[in-house]
A protein has these predicted regions:
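Short helix-loop capping/hinge motifs at secondary-structure junctions, enriched
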Residues: 223-227
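A basic- and aromatic-enriched beta-loop-alpha substructure that forms the phosphate/nucleotide-
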Residues: 84
C-alpha cells in the first residue's frame, strides 16, 4: 500500500438558492479550473492528473449524464473516469482508496448539484421502497421526521436544544461568504417557524433548493509534497450503510455512523474523538441530526447530544467547534455537502478559513451522509 494521501488544492462555488444563469457544466468548470490552476496540473500522461471522480445525482441536477460534462470542461479524455452516485464524501473515500491501493497518484474530485432544476421531494419519493414505503408517500423529509420523533422522545431532546443548533449554525454562517442563509435567528424565531413535517420546523431544515459545486485534488505523499507546501493529510477513512427499510433499525441510534467512525478512527489512531480533533464539519440536513450524528461520531455519549449543545463546547471558541462554516443548515446541496465538509476542514488546517478560522487547528473531522434517515455514513479524518 502507498504512503499517505494528501489534499493539495480545494475550491468551491458560492452556494445559491438558484444559479439560473449557470449550467451544471459551468459550475464544474469554475471549480476544476481553480484547483488545476492552484497546482499547475494538466492531464499530461505521467505527470498530470491520472483520474477524475465525480459525485452527483442526475435526477437532482436535471440533465441526464451530468457527470459526463466533467470530461468536456476539463479535457479529461483518455484518463480513468469514475462516478459516485452518492454524497461527495464517498468520492473522497473512493479517490483516496485508489491512491492507497497504488492504482493512481493524482485524482481530481468534483461534486455538483443543481437542486433548483427538479422537485426534490418527488425524486426522493421514487428512491423509497416501492412495495411498502412509496405507497404511503414516504420521502426523505418524512423519514427524517420519523427519526427526529423517535430520537427526541427516546433521549429527551427538547425543542429549545434543537433551536440552539440552528442559532449556532446561522451565527457561524455570517462569517462564510459562500453560505446561503446568513441571517441571525433566535431560539424564539426557530420555535415560531412553521412546521415542515412534524416535529421538524422549517428553520430546523436545510434550505431547498441550493445549487453549487466543489472540487479537490488529492495525491500520493510523494506527489503531494511537490505540488504544495501546505498539504493536508487524510489520516482515516470509514464508510458504512444501514438497512434501507426504516422499520428494520432503531432510528434513535446511528449504528452505521458509529461503525464508519470506528473504522476511520482506527486507521487514524484516534482514541478519544472529543480530544482528538480541533474542529469538526458534520453534514446535518436537520437540526436534530447534528446532535444525533455527534453521538454516532463519539463526540458525546449516546443520548447526550442535547447536553452537548447546552454545554457550549461546539460553539466557536469552544472545546470542539462544530460547523464553523454554518453547515448544511445554512445552505448546501445534498450531493455536494460531504465533499464540501472536507473542503472546509482542509481550509481550517491550512489556516485559510478567514473569519471562520479555528485558531491553531491541526486535526479535523469531516462527515458525509446519504439516504433516508442517515442510511449511508462516511467519515474522513485529516491533519496538517
Amino acid at each position: 500500500m502507498a504512503g499517505r494521501v494528501g489534499i493539495v488544492a480545494v475550491s468551491q462555488t458560492k452556494f445559491e438558492a438558484r444559479k439560473s444563469t449557470q449550467h451544471v457544466a459551468e459550475m464544474m468548470y469554475d471549480v476544476t479550473r481553480d484547483v488545476m490552476g492552484q497546482t499547475g496540473l494538466t492531464f499530461e500522461e505521467g505527470t498530470g492528473i491520472d483520474c477524475t471522480t465525480a459525485a452527483g445525482y442526475d435526477l437532482f441536477s436535471g440533465p441526464a449524464g451530468a457527470y459526463m460534462f466533467l470530461g468536456y470542461v476539463v479535457g479529461a479524455y483518455q484518463r480513468q473516469d469514475e462516478r459516485v452516485i452518492e454524497d461527495g464524501a464517498l468520492a473522497v473515500y473512493y479517490g483516496a482508496m485508489q491512491i492507497l491501493a497504488g492504482h493512481v497518484d493524482v485524482v481530481l474530485l468534483v461534486a455538483y448539484d443543481k437542486e433548483s432544476q427538479v422537485p426534490k421531494n418527488q425524486i426522493e419519493w421514487v428512491c423509497m421502497d416501492q412495495v411498502y414505503q412509496r405507497r404511503v408517500g414516504l420521502d426523505f423529509v418524512s423519514a427524517a421526521a420519523l427519526q427526529a420523533m423517535r430520537y427526541t422522545s427516546k433521549c429527551g431532546i427538547t425543542p429549545e436544544q434543537l433551536a440552539k443548533v440552528v442559532v449556532k449554525c446561522r451565527k457561524n454562517a455570517a462569517n462564510n461568504p459562500n453560505a446561503v442563509c446568513c441571517d441571525s435567528v433566535t431560539v424564539e424565531d426557530v420555535l415560531r417557524s412553521p412546521m415542515l413535517c412534524d416535529p421538524i420546523r422549517v428553520q430546523e431544515a436545510k434550505p431547498v433548493p441550493v445549487d453549487g459545486a466543489c472540487a479537490i485534488i488529492i495525491a500520493s505523499e510523494e506527489r503531494a509534497k511537490k505540488l504544495t507546501n501546505k498539504p493536508v493529510w487524510i489520516t482515516g477513512l470509514g464508510c458504512c450503510y444501514d438497512h434501507h427499510e426504516l422499520g428494520w433499525r432503531d432510528l434513535a441510534d446511528c449504528d452505521a455512523l458509529a461503525t464508519a467512525a470506528q473504522r476511520a478512527y482506527k486507521m487514524a489512531g484516534i482514541r478519544d474523538p472529543m480530544k482528538g480533533f480541533d474542529v469538526a464539519e458534520i453534514s446535518e440536513q436537520y437540526a436534530y441530526q447534528e446532535l444525533l450524528w455527534s453521538e454516532g461520531l463519539g463526540l458525546c455519549a449516546k443520548g447526550e447530544g442535547g447536553k452537548l449543545i447546552d454545554s457550549g463546547k461546539t460553539q466557536m471558541g469552544g472545546e470542539l467547534p462544530i460547523n464553523p462554516s454554518g453547515g448544511m443548515l445554512s445552505g448546501l446541496p445534498v450531493c455536494v455537502a460531504g465533499m464540501q465538509r472536507v473542503v472546509e476542514a482542509a481550509l481550517q488546517l491550512r489556516g485559510e478559513a478567514g473569519p471562520r478560522q479555528v485558531a491553531g487547528a491541526k486535526r479535523a473531522l469531516a462527515h458525509g451522509v446519504d439516504g433516508p434517515a442517515g442510511q449511508l455514513q462516511c467519515v474522513v479524518t485529516l491533519e496538517n
